[in-house]
Regions:
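Gly/Ser/Thr-rich active-site loops/lids in small-molecule metabolic enzymes
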Residues: 50, 54-98
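Glycine-rich beta-alpha junction loops
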Residues: 12-14, 34-36, 64-68, 93-94, ...
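ATP/nucleoside-binding phosphotransfer catalytic cores, i.e., glycine-rich phosphate-binding loops
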Residues: 15, 19, 32, 48-51, ...
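Catalytic core of DAGKc-family lipid kinases
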Residues: 1-58
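A generic structural signal for well-ordered coil/turn residues at beta-strand boundaries
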Residues: 4-6, 26, 39-41, 56-58, ...
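Short aromatic-centered micro-motifs
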Residues: 45, 67, 126
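Short Pro/Gly-enriched beta-strand edge/turn motifs at strand-loop
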Residues: 24-27, 92-94, 123-127
Length: 199
């Protein structure tokens, strides 16, 4: 059994509007966060060239359906069925309680633009799937869209996302332990093929 998971394409754009190669790919999420602990950052989120919101927060996540059960979930984002054609924009610990996660069609282009606050810029970094952090400066931006590539997952057993959620989140009708078949024999088709460790 196989399924195709959507990915995100990320390009850093300089203040002159020129994209800085190479583009990067993320399976779960792209995070734009503060570089220093104890400081909040300011940034704009734009959707297809229109301002969505100005955030004063620890950062912002853009996640795929696959990533909705990862960092995005911890930040208060929604749970999304893996095959849904959407992306989620979720603020991390926003200063305003009215700032909530937004679910968008995956054909939209998202731009995250760092901002100064009272003439000062607090340094930020961005990362993909929690890997290496890359610095970003004021005047630069991240352009995020659905990638043309997908990631193929092979399951040796039929997967049930509802059962996975019940087990992982300990909902009623679920169990505190891993249900049989949860990620058993899961392979990623890519640069190498190897079983993922059971969780």
């Amino acid at each position: 059994l196989t399924d195709e998971r959507s990915m995100l394409e990320v390009v850093r754009v300089g203040g002159d509007g020129v994209a800085a190669p190479p583009r990067k790919l993320a399976l779960n999420e792209v995070s734009l966060i503060r570089a220093q602990s104890g400081k909040m950052v300011d940034l704009d989120a734009e959707i297809d060239g229109e301002l969505l919101n100005r955030y004063h927060a620890d950062g912002v996540l853009v996640s795929t359906p696959t990533g909705s059960t990862a960092y995005s979930l911890s930040a208060g984002g929604p749970l999304v069925w893996p095959m849904s054609r959407v992306v989620c924009v979720t603020p991390i610990c926003p200063h305003s309680l009215t700032n909530r996660s937004v679910v968008l069609p995956d054909n939209m282009t998202i731009r995250l633009r760092p901002r100064e606050r009272r003439g000062r810029f607090d340094s930020m970094v961005y990362s993909l799937d929690g890997r290496s952090a890359y610095p970003i400066e004021v005047g630069e931006s991240l352009v995020i869209r659905k990638a043309p590539e997908t990631l193929s997952l092979v399951h040796l057993r039929k997967q049930n996302f509802g059962a996975l959620l019940r087990a992982k989140l300990r909902w009623q009708g679920g169990t505190a332990r891993r249900e049989p078949g949860f990620r058993d024999g899961l392979f990623i088709i890519g640069r190498d093929l190897r079983p993922l460790p059971a969780q």
